[in-house]
């Protein structure tokens, strides 16, 4: 089952947020997916990060992001050690690795082709870019999940 959360407020500020019903529904669907590539569209502010950090892991997970804040933001939501591949940060066999796309494209040889069972792409509308395709084609994960609020922002190109 998934981790459960209690929403805690202090001085009108949300300190911890729980999974919403629609996030749980997305997680239930992902649990039953066959191997392949899938796109999850959730509107801005609906908690894509909270959702993808709660996906059940069956092997190592790679999360790709194009900006520093998107690399560091998910760390607090994972219930396991998280490695970072960005600038002067390097991972060390953690169950989850969050990587800057620009950094990882120059470090692919550090990893085996079958290193990651699942790749999650944050802001997946960027995934048609050559740098993303280089990473995806290098690893060929069992499950490739893209999360975005705006799937049609880029031209209609596949990210696989």
Tell what function each PLM region has.
Residues 60, 94-96, 117-118, 141-145:
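Loop/turn-to-beta-strand initiation segments
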Residues 9-39:
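Conserved pre-motif I regulatory segment
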Residues 35-55:
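Walker A/P-loop
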Residues 122-123:
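Walker B catalytic acidic pair
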Residues 126-160:
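Post-DEXD/H (motif II) to motif III coupling segment of the RecA-like Helicase ATP-binding lobe
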Residues 80-90:
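Conserved RecA-like helicase motor-core motifs
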Residues 88-115, 129, 133-134:
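Conserved helix/coil segment N-terminal to the catalytic DExD/H
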Residues 51, 58-78:
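Conserved Walker A/P-loop ATP-binding site and its immediately adjacent core
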């Amino acid at each position: 089952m998934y981790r459960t959360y209690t929403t805690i407020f202090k001085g009108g500020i949300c300190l911890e947020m729980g999974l919403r019903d629609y996030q749980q529904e997305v997680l239930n669907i992902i649990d039953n997916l066959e191997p392949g590539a899938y796109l999850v569209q959730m509107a801005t502010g609906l908690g894509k990060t909270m959702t993808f950090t709660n996906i059940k892991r069956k092997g190592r997970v790679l999360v790709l992001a194009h900006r520093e804040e998107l690399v560091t933001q998910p760390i607090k939501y994972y219930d396991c050690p998280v490695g970072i591949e960005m600038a002067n940060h390097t991972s060390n066999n953690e169950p989850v690795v969050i990587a800057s796309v620009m950094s990882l494209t120059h470090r692919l040889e550090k990893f085996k082709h079958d290193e990651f069972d699942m790749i999650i792409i944050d802001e997946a509308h960027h995934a048609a870019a050559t740098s993303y395709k280089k990473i995806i084609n290098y690893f060929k994960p069992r499950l490739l999940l893209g999360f975005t609020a705006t799937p049609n922002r880029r031209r209609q190109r596949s990210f696989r």
